[in-house]
């Protein structure tokens, strides 16, 4: 089997006649913006101060004032399809997420995960040199693919994220969560008796 690899150096007959070459790592540029995406389940856009709500949301409003605000993103009543659309920028039907990702239906375009033919936002950013991290709920892999034994191909670290801390399925216990750190199942750092709560733990790892 012949394997061809592009090289900008030179391969001569001997090492002395050869010139090595290393590709330049991708870099987004010194002026590249940070990209922060916050997805909340069961909340409407009108509940945020930056969209005119009377509810005080100063931290979210501060992020919005220095970034971009969209007004026409299509959401669904289900979690996984909305997440798939947000991460890919495409209609959820086009990327194989017609319903929640709890199981593979056995039919095309409903395998319980984003199709491998669709790039995620994290994959695009990573290829441009960004460091990528996700914290929280994933819910984009079928339950049979979410065990500690894998397969891991639809886990966050295989869909563009360098690091991940959170849980893979649609829900988990807030005091005794089934946590994943990158590609490893881990125990919560403390117990509920010592004040543990999942929300605070996720925020701590996101900082």
Residues of each region from the PLM?
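Formylglycine-dependent sulfatase
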Residues: 1-207
